[in-house]
Amino acid sequence: MITPFFRSPDRAFTLLRGDCVELLKQFEFKFDMIFADPPYFLSNGGISMQSGKVVCVDKGEWDKGGTPESIDAFNRTWLAACRDKLKKDGTIWVSGTYHNIFSVASRLTELGFKILNVVTWAKTNPPPNISCRYFTHSAEYIVWARKSAKVPHYYNYELMKRINDGKQMGDVWRLPAIAPWEKSCGKHPCQKPLAVLSRIILASTRPGAWVLDPFAGSSTTGIAANLLGRRFLGIDKEEEYLYLSQNRRQEIENIKTFAKYRGKIKDIAFAEQTDVAHPGEDESWGYELPF
């Protein structure tokens, strides 16, 4: 019997504590979309610059690298578990840097996914390269793939075109890194900005959709999903980050805060009412988690 770590009153935001591979084996459910921000394996004692200070880039024990073989095996295992939980027409997004993204892309292909795009998130405010011996690391990569090569996926082409001044949306997104107001409940070392997750969710899901994040962290995926009228299941091992996620979700239960955060995300302004739903407005809201 699975007991949620936290569930919001409207049941649109649920958190589980544990290993995603083990937990996903324990229930039958199919998600419309998965976003995953797995370990990048870049914690190697390096340094970077933050707010004018030299800081270590290490994120934690969970982010320390192994051998190429062990990294491939790790990615193969969790991606296979996630594939089993995708609907036939579902898609998955996986973010990374050069440290892990090539392994991820190879494992996706190996497992039968069809890669649709590799989005480059070009950060408009990256930290400087203090060694001055190579180019500044100013981008992350997000692989978008569908479960099956033969089953069509959902893509909100018209909305993405509206967001991009009437032109087809490209695969290079110039968006800033996380803003200070997004850290109001605390800080996660790998927290993604709501602007990135909002675009991903609007592009690849319909209102009322179920979104899974197997490495939830501070649950930016879940906050973006709920701001956009989608539902969310997040899994993480770390109690500290689950409490941070819970606090972030409770923060937007305040109507004024909910509206303020929606107002700060540019892409939401382009979304018509048909792109955003609320609990009870769509019959798909009757499709619930089995715990």
Question: Model-flagged regions — what are they?
Answer:
Residues 244-291:
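PRPP-dependent phosphoribosyltransferase catalytic core
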Residues 1-244, 287-291:
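Core catalytic lobe of class I
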